[in-house]
């Protein structure tokens, strides 16, 4: 994944900040969306428009806990397969995280650059669209996303935790969590999924057929690999393989980033009332939309 020293150094700093941060003081709001004070700053957001994207940048957009670390690994392995050079992250890969000087430093980084983000489409720097960078948009069903988000907060040492699943569910539905409401993110991206430089990826599809998903990603990025190469990357990118190496690649948070990776884990926590509330929210926000169909909500969130 990321260059160990740089990635883990950033995570360690964020965890250190979290130690003395109460949950009620974890967020600051920028342009109507809450962000964690341990990872983002208003100064960085103000500098974000100075970021100069390149046509060969690879942008990975997702709501938190939807598989961005998984896709980061896959794309890194694809780059290695075609270039024979191990991809290294000179900066923490999430575009909006870090200090406000990072965008100047990134000008000197070699291409292609992999850029992760949890931002809405209309919050991204305009140069990404002007220079026609490739954008992979990763989605996961909202129920499993919520459960994974809770476990990340409550399992990782030093990160402020929630008193109960019920408490977290209320905050998740209100958007009082890092990067705001899942459904706001979804509505915003729904309008842009059919763009020429945009590729939609469903977490559940990757779980069902990882090799096929990797092949689609490779073709979208213009990487032409043999079946043997695709299979090799697939074996290296299973949840089990990534979890086994997570301490080395992600430091202290590694085992918590790769906790279960199961489809349907929400059934262990959701009450009937919570199910109904989420189902109604889905209908209100995404029923009849392109993204609503792509999420296969009936298959993964009902029954």
Curated annotation (Swiss-Prot):
Enzyme class: transferase
Pfam families in the record: Sulfotransfer_1
Domain of life the protein comes from: Eukaryota
Function: Sulfotransferase that utilizes 3'-phospho-5'-adenylyl sulfate (PAPS) as sulfonate donor to catalyze the sulfate conjugation of thyroxine. Involved in the metabolism of thyroxine.
Catalytic reaction equation(s): thyroxine + 3'-phosphoadenylyl sulfate = thyroxine sulfate + adenosine 3',5'-bisphosphate + H(+)
Record carries keyword Transferase: yes
Binding positions (3'-phosphoadenylyl sulfate): 65-70, 140, 148, 203, 237-242, 259-261
Tissue: Specifically expressed in kidney and testis.
Higher taxonomy: Eukaryota, Metazoa, Chordata, Craniata, Vertebrata
Family: Belongs to the sulfotransferase 1 family.
Signal peptide, first to last residue: none
Gene Ontology CC entries for this record: cytoplasm; cytosol
EC numbers, comma separated: 2.8.2.n2
Residues at the catalytic site: 118 (proton acceptor)
Keywords (A to Z) from UniProt: Cytoplasm, Transferase
GO BP, sorted A to Z: sulfation
Annotated protein name in UniProt: Sulfotransferase 6B1
